[in-house]
């Protein structure tokens, strides 16, 4: 449940009135068993000077001609601009990393960014949040939606709201949500997919995963069923619209208004129930049996907080939780479909561990290979692919790079995760790179080489929620179906709050016989 800055928001900040056409891009990954990798489409040259962005960078840098920062300036060509301002922003950032190294300066419209692709520098910036660095541009761009929600709040407000929200995500809550929400919603998805599996119709799995994660986050946050897998509504349309057009604030105003009204109504109804029942938290890992939602926990805590602040906090989790996990599921399914041996290995593990049962919280720790597949997917397709911070004071970064107060820093998670200086076989899908008997990889045990949930004080508060949701959802899906990519698709990439496909992820599904304890035992005895 990562708090994601919309990369396409950058185009709104830097390029309000210019629209550059979005072109299709093929993924640059070299996936095992894949022969589908094609270079990005070459765009025609233009009459515009190809070095205009570099000139703009030099004119905007605060260091002037006597630049003592030691940071090289990227020479941006026009061919890269449509990706920067309307497409897959992280791809030109990766190209420039290979040309200029792990840190360089870049102008995007009127803004000057220092782009970081080095784990040590990323660690320094992320760990020094609050003393040397702040969210900066993230808060400015997202305020129209999240208001003062803890995902973008700064200073003492962020500290107070984070302390209020984090206790709601305790182990007992997660254990109950796995059974009541994750499993049930995944089963509903399977039922929805069965007709397509039987008749061989192509299914846009990106769309289905988005619907699944919206239903999950609605129930987990508010005990509210969006039921987006089977129905549609103006609220669902508004949430989906926000995830696609967050930077286009005029178009998003109606969506924001409707979503805020819906959340406010849910808060009022839940508050009435809590007041009527005289409910109060009486234990550390408190869960209301009838309504285990985060909203119920926060209201039962009896903390003095305005309805507007509570609304903003919940909206932060709604949009981030829905968007992030949907993308994780999409790209993990894509990678597994490109690597049949890993898909079979994941299915065999699911069959062996679960023996036809629905997964429990305790089962998840035994789904080691599936977990590594998901982590490797988040390495190759991180959500979000960049993190933004702003220097509050003058600072010297590791490597003796100097930044001034007010400098915007763009940490390219995508670059760090794809760097050949950081990872062996960096562009390949290799789940086994993460030892199945070792700890689940995170920013700490990889020394910030792997930062899918950010790091430091502003690390995603919902990382365990999101990972559990992805593991359980895929485990249930793999129990019931196998999937193959529809041939001749152009699975390009574009960026919203996370990495999306350009045209969907179409798959053909094949129904599997669900393994029970008896069928699994019989299969083992005959082998």
Indicate residue ranges for each PLM-predicted region.
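Cytochrome P450 heme-thiolate "Cys pocket" and heme-binding signature region
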Residues: 320, 437-470, 494-496, 501
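Cytochrome P450
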Residues: 2-12, 51, 107-114, 171-184, ...
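N-terminal membrane-proximal hinge/A-helix region immediately C-terminal to the signal-anchor transmembrane segment
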Residues: 2-15, 19-148, 154-156, 160, ...
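Conserved cytochrome P450 K-helix/beta-meander segment immediately N-terminal to the heme-binding cysteine loop
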Residues: 411-441, 524
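Conserved cytochrome P450 catalytic core segment spanning the I/J/K helices
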Residues: 170-171, 252-329, 362-363, 367, ...
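Conserved cytochrome P450 K-helix E-x-x-R motif and the immediately C-terminal K′/meander segment
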Residues: 80-101, 258-261, 265, 357-399, ...
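Cytochrome P450 heme-binding "Cys pocket" and the immediately downstream C-terminal segment
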Residues: 340-342, 409, 464-500, 504, ...
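Central I-helix of cytochrome P450 enzymes
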Residues: 213, 217, 221-222, 259-264, ...
